A protein has these predicted regions:
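Generic, well-ordered alpha-helical segments
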Residues: 17, 32, 75-77
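Compositionally biased P/S/T/G-rich terminal and signal peptide-adjacent segments
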Residues: 68-88
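Non-cytosolic coordination micro-motifs
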Residues: 20-64, 89, 94-171
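Bacterial N-terminal signal peptides that target proteins for export
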Residues: 1-8
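N-terminal signal peptide c-region/cleavage motif recognized by signal peptidases
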Residues: 12, 17-19
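Extended hydrophobic/Leu-rich segments
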Residues: 6, 53, 67-69
Length: 171
């Protein structure tokens, strides 16, 4: 009787357990949505620089500020990471990761490795599409949308964006 109960309990735990993939991230690497740039710099274990908005975003920039991390290794691939802050509140709302030139993430093998890594972490993407010759994979999580965008040859970008009531966001 006790063994049968434990068996039923184990099956119930498997049925109702949340899958490892698809867990909400609410930000990126300890930097949570809504943090100020000072708070983000304190929680990261990497040196960041204040990015010049005019050069990284253009004249018609909807961002309030940006921090930049020049080299981040994700699954053996190197990325430049930007943290985007809202205007005028200056709160973190998006993180963009750009594959560095010469990084394997920019070629087809590197793209596949990053896609597989994201699928391991977040589960299967909800949508897969092609937009102007670029592959777009999207993982909508409860408070964050993760988007992998690549031409599968030399450009790969990953964007973590806070879900809000409005569309748009980080660059």
């Amino acid at each position: 009787m006790k063994r049968a109960f434990l068996g039923i309990l184990a099956v119930a735990a498997l049925v109702f357990a949340r899958p490892a993939g698809g867990e909400d991230v609410s930000g990126w690497q300890g930097a949570k949505w809504g943090m100020t740039s000072d708070q983000v710099q304190k929680v990261l274990n990497y040196p960041t620089l204040v990015a010049d908005l005019a050069s990284v975003c253009g004249e018609k920039c909807d961002e309030g500020a940006a921090l930049q991390l020049d080299d981040y290794d994700l699954s053996g691939q190197h990325f430049m990471v930007r943290f985007w802050f809202t205007k005028p509140e200056m709160r973190l709302h998006a993180v963009s990761m750009y594959a560095k030139p010469g990084s394997d993430a920019g070629d087809n093998g590197g793209f596949t490795k990053i896609k597989d890594y994201l699928q391991t972490v977040h589960g299967s993407p909800q949508s897969v599409g092609l937009n102007r010759g670029r592959f777009v994979y999207t993982w909508p999580l409860p408070s964050t949308t993760v988007t992998l965008n690549s031409n599968a040859t030399n450009q790969t970008t990953i964007v973590y964006e806070e879900k809000t009531g409005k569309a748009g966001g980080g660059s």
